[in-house]
Swiss-Prot record:
Residues 147-162, 180-191 have a biased composition (Polar residues). Residues 147-473 are annotated as: Disordered. One of its GO terms (cellular component) is pi-body. ANK repeats lie at residues 4-33, 37-72, 76-106, 110-139. This is Ankyrin repeat domain-containing protein 34A. The modification Phosphothreonine is found at T316. The keyword Membrane does not apply.
Length: 496
């Protein structure tokens, strides 16, 4: 009902029927109601074209008296004052709107104000009314300028970051356009009561009145039509190096020095990656070391392994001690030299049998478990079969890898009870003081011959020297001699 009455009010106002509009408003119609486009009855009255211009002013005055708001905008952002300036409402309608609180500085969505629409319309009286209203509010007009296109139509441009007026097309590019913003000092406002107009003839005054109210001098073209030369750019200096703080850990890194490129290098090694002042170069190639497959010469023991020859025993003492026993041991050996040698140790050192026996003696001396009984010389076959870890010269491999030699500086006991329990302490029944053998001469006048240690060589032979380099707290040779002295004394001799 109200919506229909609203449309009826707009139609009555648009047709200039004041009495019908009064009846609708008295009947309860809303004066500020708009249509689908947001247009109100006051906007319709400002845009309407009546036969009598006085009817428009009476309709606008009546609507304002009924409470119509002049600052309501439609969907395009235009107010009733803008519609009045664009539709040719005249200075009287603009004065009524300004008197009821219309704002002349409001802009629409296109950025144009009521002043711009008045300039587009070319209504000088309305424009003067708007300027007076702006001055009354303390607003200085500095953003309006006009120009005339070659075709004779007027166009308006608004500067200071404002888009051009709506509905105005730009002319051909041949016409000069005012590309500069006009200041208030360059605007010449001509009024009817100008002081300099009395000096002119009446015909000249009429011609000046036909001209626009505003005159904006165009910028003068430069005297020299040649394009100006570009100014030389100031030289750019390299930026100053920043000073690093002492707290920065990367500040202590020395700056990388540039490496001159080498023609002989390949492309990959020539590239370097720099990161935080560090230079990463290509890594050197890795070479295989201590390998029999590499280009290096194999060690001397590798030939013996491949040929199947016997390997020498590794002593715990350094090789420098093999040059000869100390002086104390030499005196002890001189006392322990046997009178008669019944063992095959007196063989020539250069003979093959002596070399084979010396090899067997080395193998026996490595472990006390494989020692032969005193005074007996095993055969080479028995000596090879009795060695559990011996190396066969034909096959070149060990027979029993489970039995290993014990290497150490501790005392090696020959007691069978202690040897059956390896890794434990010796039993308490072992006497630390063995009986002293009787070494007195026998009644036959023949001096007892001391049993020589098994496979003992000549006093000065290298085999004897090589045997004494074993580092034990108690020599196994002395234990064997003490056992031999006890067997020579017999069961009745110790009591003597």
């Amino acid at each position: 009902m109200l919506h229909t009455e609203g449309h009826a009010l707009l139609r009555a106002v648009g047709q200039g029927k004041l009495r019908l509009a009064r009846l609708l408003l008295e009947g309860g119609a809303y004066v500020n109601e708009g249509d689908a486009q947001g247009e109100t009855a006051l906007m319709a009255a400002c845009r309407a074209r009546y036969d009598d211009p006085q009817n428009k002013a009476r309709m606008v005055r009546y609507l304002l008296e009924q409470g119509a708001d002049p600052n309501i905008a439609d969907r395009l952002g235009r107010t009733a004052l803008m519609h009045a300036c664009a539709g040719g409402g005249g200075a009287a309608v603009a004065s009524l709107l300004l008197a009821h609180g219309a704002d002349p500085s409001v802009r629409d969505h296109a950025g144009a104000s009521a002043l711009v629409h008045a300039l587009d319309r070319g209504d000088r009286e309305t424009l003067a009314t708007l300027l007076d209203a702006c001055k009354a509010k303390g607003t200085e007009v500095i953003i309006i300028t006009t120009d005339t296109s070659p075709s004779g139509t007027k166009k308006t441009r608004q500067y200071l970051n404002s888009p051009p007026s709506p509905g105005v097309e730009d002319p051909a590019p041949a016409s000069p356009s005012p590309g500069f913003c006009t200041s208030p000092s360059e605007i010449q406002l001509q009024t009817a009561g100008g002081g300099g107009r009395g000096m002119l003839s009446p015909r000249a005054q009429e011609e000046e009145e036909k001209r626009d109210v505003f005159e904006f001098p165009l910028p003068k073209p430069p005297d020299d039509p040649s394009p100006s030369e570009p100014l030389p750019k100031p030289p750019r200096h390299p930026p100053k190096p920043l000073k690093r703080l002492n707290s920065e850990p990367w500040g202590l890194v020395a700056p990388p020095q540039p490496v001159p490129p080498t023609e002989g290098r390949p492309g990959i090694e020539r590239l370097t990656a720099e990161f935080n002042g560090l230079t990463l170069t290509g890594r050197p190639r890795l070479s295989r070391r201590h390998s029999t497959e590499g280009p290096e010469d194999p060690p001397p023991w590798a030939e013996k392994v491949t040929s199947g020859g016997p390997l020498s025993r590794r002593n715990t003492a350094p090789e420098a001690q093999e040059s000869g026993p100390p002086s104390g041991l030499r005196q002890k050996l001189s006392r322990m030299e046997p009178v008669e040698l019944d063992t095959p140790g007196h063989l020539c050192p250069d003979s093959p049998e002596s070399s084979r026996l010396s090899l067997e003696r080395r193998r026996y001396s490595a472990s006390p478990l494989t020692l032969p009984p005193a005074g007996s010389a095993p055969s080479p076959r028995q000596s090879q079969e009795s060695l559990p870890g011996a190396v066969s010269p034909l096959s070149g491999r060990r027979r029993s890898p489970g039995l290993l030699e014990r290497r150490g500086s501790g005392t090696l006991l020959l007691d069978h009870i202690s040897q059956t329990r390896p890794g434990f302490l010796p039993p308490l029944n072992v006497s630390p003081h063995p009986p002293i053998p009787d070494i007195r001469p026998q009644p036959g006048g023949r001096a007892p011959s001391l049993p020589a240690p098994p496979y003992a060589g000549a006093p000065g032979s290298p085999r004897t020297k090589r045997k004494l380099v074993r580092r034990h707290s108690m020599q196994t040779e002395q234990i064997r001699l003490l056992g031999g002295f006890q067997s020579l004394g017999g069961p009745g001799e110790p009591g003597r």
